[in-house]
Design a protein with these regions (language model features):
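Formylglycine-dependent sulfatase
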Residues: 2-4, 23-268
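Bacterial N-terminal signal peptides
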Residues: 9-20
Length: 268
């Protein structure tokens, strides 16, 4: 038998063996997005000292931290339209807030492509993409959506949104109290001792807002830690790509809706 035919047989056997393995085991990585609303990079891993964020800091220490990550729009749905499609807002026609754009027929939200590749895709539970997402975007998109509901061995793409840090959590008394209800006394902030950004007026109202921002971040870090703990308990952590990011800067003046650093620079 000549070398050419031997090589063809060897390649065929290798391909057959690989195909057989693929049928019994899918070792493609899982992907988990952790997305808090309205959050600047006020974390220990970015040099913040006023609060402790151990779970996000541990992610950064064990992974890849971007120090100059910017979104292409400083407000939620406009930004999210780009993340879910991989295209600029001006390309999609989603650059005007609350415009309810219609996607070009050739554009697919990328979870559809993951589903076509065999992934179980869930969103828990914010969409707000500036357009009506096609029904086939997600296997599940609601407050119960979770990787636990996939088939055995099926790779997953799971999105978890934390709305507690939204600007309404700073401005709204009841929401702020609800989100921060489980904080320990040591995790509370004294508004009188906080260092404000230099562009804010030093008034009691501003200090209270900045205090609430910090405490909401602390609550979010605990929530993120719970997701990571669950991944480990389910034996998925080592084969999961975890991406932590926010849609834009903090929900305060000169941040959210602001086109410069404080509105567009995010933790990633």
């Amino acid at each position: 038998m000549d070398w050419f035919n031997l090589r063809r047989i060897a390649l065929f056997c290798f391909a057959l063996a690989f195909a057989t393995v693929s049928l019994v085991a899918d070792d493609r990585p899982n992907i988990v997005w952790i997305i808090p609303d309205d959050m600047s990079a006020n974390f220990g891993c970015y040099g913040e000292t006023a609060i402790e964020t151990p779970h996000v800091d541990a992610l950064a220490a064990g992974g890849l931290k971007f120090t100059n990550a910017y979104v292409t729009a400083p407000v939620c749905s406009t930004c999210r339209s780009a993340f879910i499609t991989g295209m600029y807002q001006t390309t999609l026609g989603t650059h005007h807030m609350r415009c309810n754009a219609k996607l070009p027929s050739f554009v697919k939200p990328f979870p559809i492509l993951l589903r076509e590749a065999g992934y179980y895709c869930t969103n828990n539970s914010k969409t707000d993409y500036q357009f009506s997402a096609p029904r086939e975007t997600w296997d599940a998109s609601n407050g119960r959506a979770h990787w636990k509901n996939r088939k055995a061995g099926q790779p997953c793409f799971a999105v978890f949104n934390f709305g507690g840090c939204h600007e309404s959590g700073i401005a709204g008394e009841s929401k702020y109290r609800s989100v921060t209800a489980n904080l320990k006394p040591s995790q509370r902030q004294d508004p009188g001792t906080l260092k404000l950004p230099p562009y804010y007026p030093d008034t009691p109202v501003v200090r209270e807002d900045w205090k609430r921002n910090y405490e909401l971040i602390t609550a979010m870090d605990a929530w993120a830690g719970g997701l990571i703990k669950q991944l480990k308990a389910d034996g998925l952590y080592e084969n999961t790509i975890i991406i932590f990011w926010s849609d834009h800067g903090v929900g305060l003046p000169r941040a959210k809706r602001w086109l410069y650093d404080s509105g567009t620079r995010i933790p990633l």
